[in-house]
Amino acid sequence: MKIDAKMSAWIFPVHIYALLVPLILVPAIIQNESFLNERVFQQDIIFYGVIFLMAGSFFEVWQNHIDEWYVTDDSASGNGYSLLDGLFSFSILVGQCIILYAFIGNLSLIKYLCLILILVMPIMYYKKILPFLPLTIIGVANTITAYLIFGQEVIFLQFLTIALTVIFFNKLIQTENQFYHGLTTLFASSGIIFLYLAIELAANG
C-alpha cells in the first residue's frame, strides 16, 4: 500500500461511505410508498438501481486496492483503463438508468435512451471515445426528471457535487496528493443524498 496510515484513515472511510450511501434510498422508498406510487412509474425497481450503484462502488474499491490506493494519471483509478474501472462506470450507468426508468419508464423515449446508453458505453470506454458522456447524459436526465416530479430545488445540488468531483479529481491528477482522492470520492458519491432529500421534502414537507 502506497499511502500512509494517516491518509488511509481518511480514504478508507470515505470509500465505505460511497459503498453504502445508495442505501439511503431504501427507507425513502419504503416510507413514502403511497406518495411515490402516485408520482413515479414503478418505484419498486429503484431497489435494483441501488444494487447496481453499490456494485459500482465495489468495483471502484477493488480497482483502488489493485492500485494500492494511490491514484495517478496512469493508474486505472485515474485516467487509465481496466476491466474493473469499466465495470465501475458501467454499473453506475445501469443504476442511474434503472432509477430514471423507475421515474418515467412509461415514456418510450426513456426506454430507448437507456438501452442505447447501456449498449454504447462499453464500446465508448473500450475505444476511449468520450467514455464519460453516457454517464453525463443519464445524470443530467435524472436530475431534471427528479425536479419535474418532486419540484424540489435541492436536487440541483447534484450539479454542484459533479462540479466539485471534477475539480478535485483534476487536482488529484495534477498533484498526486491523495487527500483529493478522498474528496473526489466523497463528492462523486454524495449526489444521491439530494435525491433522497427531494423525495422526503416532496412527500413530507
Name these PLM-found stretches.
Residues M1-A76:
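N-terminal topogenic module of multi-pass integral membrane proteins
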Residues H15-P27, S89-A102, V140-T145, L186-A202:
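Hydrophobic cores of alpha-helical transmembrane segments in multi-pass inner/ER membrane proteins
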Residues Y17, V21-I24, Y48-W62, S91, ...:
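Lipid-exposed faces of alpha-helical membrane segments in multi-pass integral membrane proteins
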Residues I30-S34, W62-Y70, I104, I123-I129, ...:
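Juxtamembrane "helix-exit" motif on the non-cytosolic side of transmembrane helices
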Residues N37-F52, L107-C114, Q152-L160:
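Membrane-interfacial loop-to-transmembrane alpha-helix junctions, especially the N-terminal start
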Residues A55-F58, I116-Y126, T161-L172:
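Aromatic-anchored segments of alpha-helical transmembrane domains
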Residues L83-F150:
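Membrane-proximal helix-loop-helix units in multi-pass membrane proteins
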Residues I149-G205:
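Terminal transmembrane helical module of multi-pass membrane proteins
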